[in-house]
Amino acid sequence: MPVTVKVRRVGQRGPPLELPRYETDGAAGLDLRADEPVTLAPGERRLVPTGLALEIPPGHEGQVRPRSGLAVRHGVGMVNAPGTIDSDYRGEVGVVLVNHGQEPVTFARGDRIAQLVIGPVVRAELALVEDLASSGRGGGGFGSTGR
């Protein structure tokens, strides 16, 4: 079921870019675009502005996720993936990109740099206890189930 996310343009770095949209009927994410040109040297990370601020409905969040094509073709990913946009955040959405490749990568203003996925949030109530229920996995982590 669709939810309405209000969008405001911010930054005024040039003519308005098109609003994020789903590129296919089955797409989970809306494409976010760079609102200014940026070149990332190998190993460099940078916060890239999108020119958008959002009003996400209460009970929902936005997740900013990397685009797989950028990773495959250029070695570009996100430092904090996914990045979380809380429903009460009203500032400009930025994407922290990093170039893991061997060559500089340039994005023009308007290039697609990430995806925005809107989803529900479940808030937990924590209960402090003396013991936890046992499980088949126990305390094994960090690849322990792949032996």
Curated annotation (Swiss-Prot):
The keyword Hydrolase applies. Substrate binds at residues 67-69, 80, 84-86. Pathway: Pyrimidine metabolism; dUMP biosynthesis; dUMP from dCTP (dUTP route): step 2/2. Keywords: Hydrolase, Magnesium, Metal-binding, Nucleotide metabolism. One of its GO terms (biological process) is dUMP biosynthetic process. It is an enzyme of class 3 (hydrolase). Disulfide bonds: none annotated. Its cofactor is Mg(2+). It catalyses: dUTP + H2O = dUMP + diphosphate + H(+). InterPro entries: dUTPase, dUTPase-like, dUTPase-like_sf, dUTPase_trimeric. Its EC number is 3.6.1.23. Pfam families: dUTPase. One of its GO terms (molecular function) is dUTP diphosphatase activity. HAMAP family: dUTPase_bact. Belongs to the dUTPase family. This enzyme is involved in nucleotide metabolism: it produces dUMP, the immediate precursor of thymidine nucleotides and it decreases the intracellular concentration of dUTP so that uracil cannot be incorporated into DNA. This is Deoxyuridine 5'-triphosphate nucleotidohydrolase.
